[in-house]
Amino acid sequence: HNVKKYTAERDAVAVPWATQGYYLSERPLFTADPLFHAGCYYVQEASSMFVEQVVKQYVSEPVRALDLCAAPGGKSTHLLSALPQGSMLVSNEPMPLRAQILAENVTKWGNPASVVTKNLPADFASFKDFFDFILVDAPCSGEGMFRKEPKAVEQWSVSNVEMCAERQKEI
């Protein structure tokens, strides 16, 4: 589909660090859009798209990449678009339900150079020196969601922050 026409109709402004990223003036109901369900685009925060700049800066030839904590798949789909032709991406998520969502999103994206796994991060220790590029966006307390999701504030707790910190240490 024509991304420029599609985004112009929605009063979109380009994200400076992402070639196909756009800020929208209002949040449409994406779940009612057949193009969203077809995998034509993925909705995520602009900050999540910064991974494209890392790839542009450091990756110039095909690589084997690992997105260790990949669900729901925004960074993985963005990586699949940014990595050089001939690269392979392993998108991992140990939580079964989240891994299913990840697999759906990566499949809809339509890039065959990807594999989805459901392993614990420690399982990849035996792959020392196999991956050229590893992305770790470790699970966190969700404070970044406060401005767009009021319920996130209600779900915040010190114990959740501590649990996330322990999980990050394990990863």
Where are these predicted regions, by residue range?
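S-adenosylmethionine
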Residues: 1-171
